[in-house]
UniProtKB/Swiss-Prot annotation:
Its EC number is 7.1.2.2. The record marks 362 as: Required for activity. ATP binds at residues 169-176. It catalyses: ATP + H2O + 4 H(+)(in) = ADP + phosphate + 5 H(+)(out). GO terms for molecular function: ADP binding; ATP binding; proton-transporting ATP synthase activity, rotational mechanism. This is ATP synthase subunit alpha. SUPFAM superfamilies: C-terminal domain of alpha and beta subunits of F1 ATP synthase, N-terminal domain of alpha and beta subunits of F1 ATP synthase, P-loop containing nucleoside triphosphate hydrolases. F-type ATPases have 2 components, CF(1) - the catalytic core - and CF(0) - the membrane proton channel. CF(1) has five subunits: alpha(3), beta(3), gamma(1), delta(1), epsilon(1). CF(0) has three main subunits: a(1), b(2) and c(9-12). The alpha and beta chains form an alternating ring which encloses part of the gamma chain. CF(1) is attached to CF(0) by a central stalk formed by the gamma and epsilon chains, while a peripheral stalk is formed by the delta and b chains. HAMAP family: ATP_synth_alpha_bact. Its main location: membrane.
Length: 502
């Protein structure tokens, strides 16, 4: 058998053509310093700001400081296994989190890794944690109400879909309870809720998850948690991760509520990172871009125009105050970014007014646009009644002789305070809220003793379920008040059955 040179050369050419190079080109640097959750690396010349990088022990990091001779990297995990001289590798991707329907009902950390012990999250889609907020032309004004189920909020400081409403108050004034009740009330409201817990005890987060599960909320809720024991970079990233997960649904035309509990702890974590990265400190040792930290996050909440699918992302950020001081640095920053604030006051909380909302300092800059027509009609005078009552309350306590009109104002105010009280985790449908506030503002409760008002309200709801379904249905479907004569007759009929306590 003779060997033919042409065949050999043809085979060699074929081999060369089919040869695939296995060489991988990657940008690799060397760790020159590590400690306190921060690493400095030399050699990552082309790394981007905010890019994810990988250390030799598979722990991820994020490039934050791009300096002349080195890169400052925050380590997103335990840093004890990283040492000087270790390799650090670029990924070429800006920091991103997994997104999608499969996250609903899960508890994840800010990197999207499950922490609930229910196995991996099956999703292939990701979104960068930082993205540009929708532009002016991509938005439309907020016009759909987000029903919280809390009378004091839905009547006095209404929240609309796509709004950013700050919840501010001292610790232990019921901020988290307001958020949980709002999430519970979104059942059957076509809403996806994301609860972001920053710097809280793991036991507290477990209690919140348990409460949500008890009320069937996991069917539409994602919990993102960066607990107090986690490294500061994860606390800093948590709200961005939560909003990125929400944006995925908003772009698909769905409605999303993101609760951020709370931004004070995120600001403290960012301050810690900035000081460790040797960025120059400013007021209260916060870095100069602390305002931008929160503004670029909250600007991503929006109500999209119909051309963009009409989805919305509503943000409820929390800020914790010290001794009720809302004029401190972080509170004033966030107040100026958001579309209003709900101020929870510890004095009211301890005096039994719960939710402890200070109606005078709380405001919604969207206002009536975020209320149904019926609520707008009945709740118009409520804020004035409360303000007048708070003013006259001091005089009434001294027992000084008051004229008839003032006495009537004080009596109405006391009943208003009672009606706005609410039990924990018992959100009330808006149609029932409208009817009890109608009864209050039209004077039907004026002859009911103050101590009986809460019982009157509970029994009135039960009576409506039995005998007033047509009234509730009318408000539900038309969003407007039924015929006032029918309403008055119904309330009078119930009052005849109500027994005042002796």
């Amino acid at each position: 058998m003779s060997i033919r040179a042409e065949e050999i050369s043809a085979l060699i050419k074929q081999q060369i053509e089919n040869y695939e190079s296995q060489i991988q080109v990657s940008d690799v640097g060397t760790v020159i310093q590590v400690g306190d959750g921060i690493a400095r690396a030399h050699g990552l010349d082309n790394v981007m700001s905010g890019e994810a990088v990988e250390f030799a022990n598979a722990v991820m990091g994020m490039a934050l400081n791009l300096e002349e001779n080195n890169v400052g990297i925050v380590i997103l995990g335990p840093y004890t296994g990283i040492k000087e001289g270790d390799e650090v590798r670029r990924t070429g991707r800006i920091m991103e989190v997994p997104v999608g329907e499969t996250l609903i009902g899960r508890v994840v950390n800010p990197l999207g890794q499950p922490v609930d012990g229910l196995g991996p999250v099956e999703t292939t889609e990701t979104r960068p944690i930082e993205s540009r907020a929708p532009g002016v032309m991509d938005r439309r004004s907020v016009h759909e109400p987000l029903q919280t189920g809390i009378k004091a909020i839905d009547a006095l400081v209404p929240i609309g879909r796509g709004q950013r409403e700050l919840i501010i108050g001292d610790r232990q004034t019921g901020k988290t309870s307001v958020a949980i009740d709002t999430i519970i009330n979104q059942k059957d409201q076509n809403m996806i809720c994301i609860y972001v817990a920053i710097g809280q005890k793991e036991s507290t987060v477990a209690t919140v998850v348990e409460t949500l599960a008890k009320h069937g909320a996991p069917d539409y809720t994602i919990v993102v948690t960066a607990s107090a024991s986690q490294p500061a970079p994860l606390l800093f990233l948590a709200p961005y991760a939560g909003v990125a997960m929400g944006e995925y649904f908003m772009i698909m035309g769905k409605h999303v509520l993101v609760v951020i509990d709370d931004l004070s702890k995120q600001a403290a974590a960012y301050r810690q990172l900035s000081l460790l990265l040797r960025r120059p400190p400013g007021r209260e040792a916060y870095p100069g871009d602390i305002f931008y930290l929160h503004s670029r996050l909250l600007e991503r909440a929006a109500k999209l125009s119909d051309a963009k699918g009409g989805g919305s992302l509503t943000a409820l950020p929390f800020v914790e105050t010290q001794a009720g001081d809302i004029s401190a640095y972080i509170p004033t920053n966030v107040i100026s970014i958001t579309d209003g604030q709900i101020f929870l006051q510890s004095d009211l909380f301890f005096s039994g007014v719960r939710p402890a909302i200070n109606a005078g300092l709380s405001v919604s800059r969207v206002g009536g646009a975020a209320q149904i027509k019926a609520m707008k009609k009945v709740a118009g005078t409520l804020r004035l009644d409360l303000a007048a009552y708070r003013e006259l309350e001091a005089f009434a306590q001294f027992g000084s002789d008051l004229d008839k009109a003032t006495q009537a104002n004080v009596a109405r105010g006391a009943r208003t305070v009672e009606v706005l009280k609410q039990d924990l985790h018992q959100p009330i449908p808006v149609e029932k809220q409208v009817l009890i506030i109608y009864a209050l503002t039209r004077g039907f409760l004026d002859d009911i003793p103050v101590e009986d008002v809460r019982r009157f309200e509970k029994e009135f709801y039960l009576w409506l379920d039995q005998n007033g379904q047509h009234l509730l249905e009318h408000i539900r479907t038309t969003k407007d008040l039924p015929n006032e004569d029918d309403l008055n007759q119904a309330i009078e009929a119930f009052k005849k059955t109500f027994v005042v306590s002796q």
